[in-house]
Amino acid sequence: MPTNFSAWDSLPISTTQRAFSETYNLEEKERKEAADLNKNYYYGKQEGDVVLMNDDVNPITMNITKPIVSKRCSLLYSRPLVREWDGSPRSIAYLEQVYKDNKIDSLLGKVDLYAELTGSVLLHPTIDENLPGQIRLVLYDASEFSSAGNDDDPNTADAIALTRILSRLVDSSGVTSDGRRQPQIEKTILQQIWTNDAVTMYEGNQVVVSEPNELGFLPFVNFQGEEVHNAYVGYPMATIVRKLNSHINQLLTHIGYTIKMQSGTPIVFSGFKSGETVVVHPGRAINIPEGATANVLNLDPKIQESLDFIKYLEDRLYTTSSVPKITVEGGEGRSGRELMVRWFPLWKVFQEKANRYNIYEMQLANMILTIAGLEPINDLKIHWPEESILPLSSADDNLERDIKLNIVSPIDEIMRRDPHMSEIDAEAEYMLNASQNAMLNQTNQVL
């Protein structure tokens, strides 16, 4: 008789135990392995993922993952950003110091990259008395942590388990079958599990130390690659790219081996009797017995058809990742508007990410202020680098006309291109450029 189990019959377990068991969950293990594989593909470590038919096959790989992921991560933090804070002067001054200490735009550029590769990145503010602001922001990508979800709000977490593999020498006297010494290495999982109440360190399944969490909350801000409904860890867009990249590598390897086989000119012999041999005269001819035949094996590898299919997969790869090929390899359009249309999918990615990252940065800022015991800020406006997203905008098409009609001024345009520049500095640069251009025009007229 089947047994019906009810949630009412089970014993409750602590949040720490839930986070501990989540680390050993099979699906969680596969998720982390996929995240690591995405990173390997991005950094060009792809040969180990190619399936070889035999030892005579050499893997051929082409790293398409890196340019596509890099393009998606070049949208937000391509230059130092201007941030407008709404809050108390003391809180704003402290945030600016912490951001300066941590080189925030460079750090968040890495956050963006690893969120694309692994699905999520946690930024963890920790105390560092060696820094002027005494806060260091530590990055953990989704291959380095597990989470115990909140049943009421699965988009949040009740616990975070920071994980790493610990290797320890347990026996240095081991000897292999050929007489060589082979030290025995034991690998265990080291976990630091954070809950609202405690911070517990595990080595394997043993508790090393457990301390109260004096903050009373989880000091982590979750930057997601792509938000997933009712999930704390986001989706890594690099997974789509990596899987198609894997198929392309496999096809390239097959083609390379086929060409290698074909260049060897395989010959098929038939009609031989027992004991008869083939005499080969290098560079001239082959002697075969009477009645026997020798034919060149036509492999018919259909190389061009295979290359066409690879090109099709490559095109689909760019399309499914919302990175138009023109944005990576370059290209021209008949007008700025045509280029805008072709770049539009990437522009939509920029808009969606900018909206989310503005929220993430707001959460990060207020978490830093909470840890420091300062008043939270009310609002944050980030001047994202829109000018670097498209090769040409409709405003650029009409810029000369707008200046002539006094809709905008050259000083406005200088400040748009460099938001850090004040109006006085922009005016000074305009006057300097105008003077230099006038001198060059006079020189050209004399010549």
Located regions from the model:
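Extended, helix-rich architectural segments
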Residues: 1-138
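Extended, charged amphipathic alpha-helical segments
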Residues: 202-341, 383
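Extended, regular secondary-structure scaffolds
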Residues: 112, 116, 122-228
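Short coil/turn segments at secondary-structure boundaries
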Residues: 87, 110-112, 126-127, 260-267, ...
